[in-house]
Each structure stands twice: as C-alpha cells, then as structure tokens.
C-alpha cells in the first residue's frame, strides 16, 4: 500500500500539500467558487467540472483528458473514475463519516480518510496499481464532497 499525507496549506484552507510514497511533493489548489482544481505532481494537471448540472469531472493535462469521473446519483457519495490504465470507484465508507473507500471490481484496495473528525488533514492509502496522480484525483473528488457538506 502507498500512503500519501495530505496537509492543508492553512488553518481554514481547502488547498493541500501532499507527500508520501512515490510522491515527493505535490500540491492541490482548489478554485474558490467552482468544483475545479489544479494538481502539481510535479507536472500540472487540471481537474475540470464538465457540466454545472451533472456530476462529471475530467483530469486534463495539456488539453488531453487523462481520466474522467462521474457521480451517477446526486444522492450518494460514489464516483466512478475511468482512465486508459485503470477503472475504479470511490464510495463513502459510512454515511456518518467523511472517509471514502477506493474500490476496484467492488473490492476495497484503499481508503481516503481524515486524520480525525475535526480536521482537514487526511491520508490516502491505496494499492500502487492506481497511479499517484489518479489517487490525488480521487482525493480531489472526496474534498469536493467535504466542501459541499461544510457549506450545507
């Protein structure tokens, strides 16, 4: 299992510095008003929301889509992530907790979890079959859900 440590850049910030196995230093910077972000790992990747009304995002590098994510049901915390290399899902581990499971073929292969209930610090633990940038993309989708919950 690879472990990535996600540390907010400030006390009330949703932006992150990410470090850990196979990831020397990465950063995740969120758009203030939209569900979009930029991943630096060390190359730059954009996370773009494809539609205002549907839960669809793309991971883009140099105008090339590397992966896409879809939230098929707005009432669940589940996203399907598709790329040329791997296909997997993230799903809320428990309706009362912020943690997400990373699933491949309906089998858990990792988790995205806050350090404790009152922090934005988090860890990503995942099988190395999923590339680091896709692990961070999955984390980005989890943070979008956390931000929506914090606003509501």
Where on the chain are the PLM-derived regions?
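Intrinsically disordered, low-complexity proline/glycine-rich segments
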Residues: 1-152
